[in-house]
Regions:
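Conserved small/polar residues in nucleotide/adenosyl-binding loops
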Residues: 217-224
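Extracytoplasmic, non-cytosolic globular domains
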Residues: 182-213
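Aromatic-rich carbohydrate-recognition surfaces in CAZymes
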Residues: 63-189, 202
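Acidic/polar, glycine-enriched structural segments that form the non-catalytic walls/loops
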Residues: 1-61, 95, 136
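Secretory-pathway/luminal and periplasmic proteins that interact with or process carbohydrate-rich
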Residues: 14-20, 98-104, 209-216
C-alpha cells in the first residue's frame, strides 16, 4: 500500500514539463490560426521571463495535460502536497494569455491545443488565489484575464446564446461545466471586492436550473 500510495503521488506530477531554458528564454507558439484542436500558421517567437532581484526567473513556463475536471482532484492535491505548483501554474497560464490572448486548456510547446472544452484553468487559478497561494502573478490581472476568457471569443467557448439564456443548447454537460467555471470566477470576485462582477458571474452560474424541469430527475438538454 505504501508503494502504491507514493507511486500514485508521483503520477500526479507527470504530464507537466518546464519549457524555459536556463537563461529564461522560452518558445511562444500562441500566435497562429485555430484549426479544430490545433493551431496552424504559427509565428514562432522567443520570449524571456522576467527575473527577481536575486536574478531568478519569477516563475517557469510549462507544458501540461489539459486541466479538464482537475477541480475534483489535482487542484486539491497540489494545494496540499506541492503548494508552490498552483502558484507556478497560475502564473504560467496567465502569461500564456498575455502572449496570445487565451488561457490554455492544456499548454503544449508554448502554444494552444484547444483539447477538451470550456476554460478549465479558471478553477485552478481561483483555487490558488482563494487558498492564499498566489504570489507570482497579480490577482487582479489574473481575474481580468479570466473574465475576458469567459466572454465570447475567449477560451470558454460560449456565445451570445449562453449570455442570454444561461445554458448551452443541446448540451447539458457543457452547460454544467460553463456554469461551474462562472461560479468559480464569482468566488474570486467576492474575495477581490468586485461586487458587480461577483453578482454577474454568480447569476450566470445558475443557468443549469433551466435544464432541470420539476417533472424530471435529471438534467435535460434543451434543443434551443
Amino acid at each position: 500500500q505504501r508503494t502504491k500510495f507514493y507511486t500514485d503521488l508521483w503520477h500526479v506530477l507527470l504530464g507537466r514539463h518546464k519549457i524555459d531554458d536556463v537563461n529564461g528564454e522560452y518558445p511562444d507558439l500562441t500566435d497562429g490560426q485555430r484549426a479544430g484542436s490545433f493551431t496552424r500558421d504559427i509565428r514562432v517567437k522567443t520570449r524571456t521571463l522576467p527575473r527577481d532581484a536575486a536574478g531568478r526567473v519569477v516563475h517557469h513556463m510549462y507544458n501540461s495535460d489539459a486541466f479538464w475536471l482537475t477541480q475534483w482532484n489535482l487542484n486539491v492535491l497540489w494545494g496540499l502536497g506541492w503548494p508552490e505548483m498552483p502558484d507556478e501554474m497560475s502564473a504560467s497560464l496567465i502569461r500564456y494569455a498575455d502572449n496570445g490572448g487565451l488561457i490554455p486548456r492544456g499548454p503544449c510547446a508554448g502554444g494552444y491545443t484547444y483539447i477538451m472544452s470550456g476554460c478549465p484553468a479558471t478553477p485552478l487559478i481561483v483555487s490558488a488565489y482563494n487558498k492564499g497561494l498566489m504570489r507570482k502573478c497579480d490577482p487582479m490581472h489574473a481575474f481580468r484575464t479570466m473574465q475576458r476568457n469567459h466572454m465570447p471569443g475567449g477560451m470558454q467557448g460560449i456565445g451570445e446564446f449562453y449570455l442570454e439564456h444561461g445554458y448551452q443548447p443541446k448540451n447539458a454537460g457543457m452547460t454544467i461545466e460553463s456554469n461551474f467555471q462562472d461560479w468559480a470566477l464569482a468566488q474570486m470576485a467576492v474575495r477581490l471586492g468586485l461586487e458587480d462582477k461577483a453578482a454577474y458571474f454568480g447569476n450566470r452560474s445558475h443557468g443549469w436550473r433551466k435544464l432541470y424541469p420539476v417533472s424530471y430527475t435529471h438534467l435535460r438538454a434543451h434543443e434551443t
